[in-house]
Regions:
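Intrinsically disordered, low-complexity segments enriched in small/polar residues
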Residues: 1-2, 142
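Sec-dependent N-terminal signal peptides
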Residues: 3-15
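Intrinsically disordered, low-complexity segments enriched in polar/charged small residues
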Residues: 7, 154-155
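Transmembrane beta-barrel domains of Gram-negative outer membranes and organellar outer membranes
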Residues: 17-153, 166-167, 177
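Mobile, glycine-rich extracellular loop/lid and propeptide segments
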Residues: 158
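A mid-sequence, solvent-exposed acidic-amphipathic segment
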Residues: 161-179
Length: 179
């Protein structure tokens, strides 16, 4: 019985990937140049450390543009009281500025303000200069540009390259830490 169950799970994983109607929006948590088709939506959730969860709803406005909202909740899987990261949801926006061709990759410009982990606030006072910062344990991607090229050589093979800059989550004390 265990043998047949393993075969069933293996075949289900293989064939479910073939039927995917659109390219991946993210590789785990790293953005790609995939966008949602017009009129479609996704509802995803990401489990993070300390029993946190980040639900995310994204909607395809056009074939090249989508917008999403997410909200970080800490202690979701815990006996503690729920702790919401911020009073407002975070935003994800992605616009494909160049469609993938036979020779050139697809290119997207995006914004993701959702960081991972707890939202931290620190206020230093006393002998030090007053330093105020608010940021996530793992900073949000911020503004990013990603290029993706896919091949059907060995199934579905893709190469994704990108750059990002988060300009609003800063820490004046640990400014050298990119995370």
């Amino acid at each position: 019985m265990k043998y047949y169950l393993n075969i069933f799970i293996f075949l289900t994983l293989i064939f479910s990937q073939v039927e995917q109607p659109y390219p991946p929006l993210d590789l785990v948590t790293i953005p790609t140049s995939g966008t949602l088709p017009k009129g479609s939506f996704t509802l995803e959730s990401l489990l993070v450390k300390d029993g946190g969860i980040i639900p995310k709803l994204s909607v395809g406005i056009t074939d090249n543009f989508y917008i999403g909202l997410s909200y970080g909740i800490q202690d979701f899987i815990s006996e503690e009281k729920l702790d919401f990261n911020k009073p407002m949801p975070e935003v994800q926006i992605k616009y494909r500025i160049y469609e993938e061709s036979e020779t050139l990759p697809a290119v997207v410009l995006g914004l993701d303000t959702q960081g991972k982990g707890r939202f931290l606030s620190r206020y230093e006072d006393g002998d030090n200069v007053v330093a105020n910062f608010q940021r996530y344990e793992q900073k949000a991607w911020g503004w990013y540009i990603v290029a993706s090229k896919n091949w059907t050589l060995l199934g579905n093979l893709g190469l994704h390259v990108g750059l990002n800059k988060n300009t609003w989550e800063t820490d004046p004390i640990e400014n050298e830490d990119p995370n």
